Regions:
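General secondary-structure propensity
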Residues: 7-12, 282, 643-649
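Noncatalytic linker/hinge segments flanking ATPase motor cores
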Residues: 49, 56-59, 112-121, 192-200, ...
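Hydrophobic alpha-helical and helix-loop surface patches within well-folded domains
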Residues: 155, 187-444, 558, 569-578, ...
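Short alpha-helical hairpin
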Residues: 93, 178-182, 243-244, 330-332, ...
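Small/polar loops that bind or transfer phosphate-bearing groups
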Residues: 37, 268, 666
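Acidic/His-enriched low-complexity segments
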Residues: 1-223, 248, 253, 324-327, ...
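Non-catalytic accessory/interaction domains
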Residues: 126-129, 134, 145, 151, ...
């Protein structure tokens, strides 16, 4: 079967949130045609104006066409949804917009279609709305036809693309366009938000230019809209030519924190990378989702690092992508990067740290092994060969192998099709180095898996590269080994354990990050003692590189959350030592590091929080990077007396960046009933559905109120579950929430979920419980 085009007319009733549609589909088919249609009433199917029979099935219709080439017409009607997928309503203030979210399999909730990424087609969309409404789609407006107090907006035809990339937005918008070159780049917001659009507009222009140059393929559409949606389940979505974002992932200005501006840059870069990897070339089926997400993640860091070198974005990469992926992939509940997807309901479960962070980290490892030029040459060849069509992982390996002459296919087979990653133990005997690999498991177990590992090793100052394809390998350098280090620049996706830390050579920031990250998770796996771990930490009490400092601070803060009596002393000692170093530094990464240390201290030290809370009276003049910490401190030290003040400030903020600041503070109170009151704001709509994703993990990380939060979750778990139904996100929320929330009550949590199973979140619950049991060993 092949589909040539969908010609879609939508008559939209914005007031009553419903619509009717007439759709003409040109295709050729050899047998029965099945159109996916969920929550849509199909009223007729016609050929040449004549009604033909069709059968309604659950979430689809079947049309007995036999061998057919031509055009069919489908008439249908449907209501706008409220569950953040398909075509849905996104409220803001006293108004709303209508937006769409079709990835992975939700286009069927808007129009009858073959909702499968392999069946690409051109789309021609026309929408009839009231005169005062604006409409956005993937392409520019071709013409507008007035009809009394209504109008029909006809959009230009799209290139061939998958159904999940179609977009429709309806409402009242403000726009900020850059017409300086092709394509036109615009930021679109709901009324009153456009003042924070200049920075994202500039990023959009810069990243499109970067990708056109890197990929050697011009951006193929006339325009690129970056659309801020006030209620959005995910971070962003790469609809071709009409990218949607939650407001905190798109909007920023000079008053924004560096963390906010960096996030905006990264998310824009990620979604724009998809315009080539995902939109121009699309995976054949969701098994290869990682082809889209891993590449967009990897390329976004490369793009940001090029545009903003002062942000050291490869450092951010190991902090934000590699570290999280290595944790999740060391659990028993994980999956290969190339995950088998047989049912559409399984698709949402693989939008996770493996498909994004691990896949991107493997690409970084492969680029380091091939060299940047050969890697880029292979990518360009792949895009040229498969543009406007679909591809599989092996197609990419072949392109990279042909460009480099290296066995990329063999290496990727090892890393993509099996889960997990290795621990490499390094020992020295005279002139010999012994490398031993075994799969690293966070609970201390292992199995017989081996990996084909591109190893970088420096011995006595001399760099060596090799492929380790066996369990044990011995290297004789012919002279006594005085110093060495393995995994240069933390480019490899593996952990390293040294038999003798005293002979480890001098390390850069990335390598120090790798060392402290590896030793923390070796501690959790009971493969090093706390004394060995503490020795590594104490060697860095006066460390001046932000990467190991940020990592150690996060580790010690985590240990504080697990057991403040046991680990609080070391955590406070490290933070106080580091605060002195970073307090007066003014470069961007130093301010970010200092802010991270200060936020941790607010939750660890009541006196510190009380002192910092005094800054709240002059919040407008506080460093934007410290505002989160100041508001948290005001809440944490003020207690019940200031709760209503913080809540009112949360409710009255215009921009989501500030709303998130106050929401975080509302979950930082030391009093359990106040935090629970905040969680219950989600019942009234005070907290958006999209933010349920955030509030439960945040509440679980408040060590003073966990008992109250657990009681609330047991009582009201059906509310967040129903709010996020269909998005596939609730499992991830529980995976992130249970490890800390369940501390001290492992059996109770286990019993609760055995009595109240949540099938769509089963994997996330199992991951969370596995991590909870590992953490409990630290108590």
């Amino acid at each position: 079967m092949q589909i040539e085009y969908y010609n879609i007319f939508i008559d939209f009733d914005f007031k009553n949130l419903k619509y009717s549609g007439i759709e003409k589909i040109k295709l050729n088919v050899d047998d029965e045609l099945v159109l996916d249609a969920e929550g849509i009433e199909v009223t007729s199917v016609k050929i040449n104006g004549n009604n033909i029979n069709f059968a309604k099935r659950e979430n689809s219709i079947s049309i007995p066409l036999g061998k057919f080439t031509g055009e069919i017409e489908v008439d249908f009607q449907a209501k706008v949804r409220d569950d953040l997928v398909g075509i849905y309503v996104a409220p803001y203030g006293d108004s709303y917009m209508v937006s769409t979210q079709f990835e992975s399999s939700h286009a069927r909730k808007f129009i009858p279609c073959v909702d499968n990424p392999a069946y690409k087609a051109e789309f021609k969309l026309s929408v009839k709305v009231d005169e005062d409404l604006d409409v956005i789609s993937n392409t520019p407006v071709e013409r507008i036809v007035r009809d009394g107090n209504r109008k029909i907006i006809e959009f230009m035809k799209t290139p061939r693309m998958s159904t999940y990339l179609l977009y429709l937005g309806i409402g009242k918008f403000e726009v900020n366009y850059d017409f300086s070159s092709s394509p036109i780049v615009g930021v679109i917001t709901t009324p009153g938000k456009i003042s924070r659009s200049d920075i994202p507009k500039q990023f959009g222009r810069q990243f499109i230019s970067f990708y056109e140059n890197y990929f050697g393929v011009k951006y193929p559409l006339p325009k690129e809209d970056l659309i801020a949606v006030p209620e959005f389940a995910f971070g962003a979505m790469e609809n071709w030519g009409a990218i949607t974002f939650r407001e905190t992932a798109l909007l920023a200005d000079k008053t924004s924190s560096l963390r906010q501006t960096m996030r905006v840059a990264e998310v824009i870069a990620h979604e724009l990378a998809h315009q080539w990897f995902g939109d121009l070339v699309t995976m054949k089926w969701w098994d290869d989702l990682w082809l889209n997400e891993s590449f967009a993640t990897f390329m976004s860091y490369k793009a940001v690092n090029t545009i903003k070198p002062e942000w050291d974005y490869w450092g951010q990469f190991v902090l934000d992508e590699t570290a999280g992926a290595m944790l999740k992939d060391s659990l028993h509940i994980t999956h290969p990067i190339e995950a088998k997807v047989e049912k559409i309901e399984d698709i949402e479960q693989i939008f996770d740290d493996i498909s994004y962070g691990k896949g991107a980290s493997i690409l970084r490892m492969i680029e380091a092994y091939l060299g940047e030029e050969d890697f880029r040459k292979g990518i360009r060849s792949y895009l040229e060969q498969y543009k406007y069509s679909n591809a599989k992982g092996e197609n990419l390996w072949k392109s990279l192998k042909d460009a480099s002459g290296k066995p990329v296919d063999r290496i990727m087979e090892s890393w993509i099709k099996q889960e997990g990653y290795p621990l490499i133990t390094v020992s020295i005997n005279g002139s010999k180095v012994k490398l031993e690999q075994k799969r690293f498991m966070q609970d201390g177990s292992t199995d017989e898996k081996t990996y084909l590992i591109p190893i970088t090793i420096e011995i006595n100052g001399k760099r060596t590269e090799m492929l380790l394809d066996e369990k044990n390998k011995e290297i004789d350098v012919g002279t006594d080994i005085k110093s060495l280090k393995v995994n240069l620049n933390k480019a490899g996706f593996y952990r390293v354990k040294y038999a003798d830390l005293n002979r480890v050579s001098e390390m850069n920031g990335l390598e120090k990050f790798g060392l402290v990250n590896d030793y923390f998770y070796l501690l959790l796996a009971k493969q090093v003692t706390f004394q060995e771990y503490e020795k590594v930490i104490r060697s860095m009490l006066k460390e001046y590189n932000y990467l190991p400092v940020r990592e150690i601070a996060d580790q010690l803060y985590f240990l504080f959350l697990v057991n403040k009596e046991k680990y609080g002393g070391l955590a406070l000692e490290f933070h106080k030592s580091q605060l002195e170093i970073w307090a007066t530094k003014t470069d961007p990464l130093s301010r970010l590091t200092y802010a991270s240390l200060v936020e941790n201290m607010v939750m660890m030290d009541n006196d510190f929080a009380k002192d910092l809370s005094k800054e709240y009276t002059r919040l407008d003049s506080v460093d934007p990077n410290l505002k989160d910490a100041v508001v948290m401190a005001y809440a944490a030290s003020g207690g019940e007396r200031v709760y209503d003040e913080i809540l009112n400030a949360y409710r009255t903020q215009k921009f989501d960046e500030e709303k998130q600041r106050y929401l975080k503070a509302l979950l930082s109170f030391r009093e359990g009933h106040l935090v629970v009151n905040t969680l219950s704001l989600s019942f009234t709509g005070d907290i958006k559905k999209q933010d349920i994703v955030r509030i439960l993990p945040l509440a679980s990380s408040n060590p003073y109120t966990r008992g109250a939060v657990w009681t609330w979750l047991k009582t009201y778990i059906d509310f967040p579950r129903k709010s996020l139904a269909g998005t596939g996100i609730f499992g991830r929320v529980l995976s992130d929430t249970l490890p800390l929330l369940g501390i001290g009550r492992v059996e109770e949590v286990k019993k609760f979920f055995s009595l109240h199973p949540i099938p769509e979140a089963e994997k996330g619950i199992e991951q969370g419980m596995e991590m909870l049991e590992i953490i409990s060993n630290l108590i």
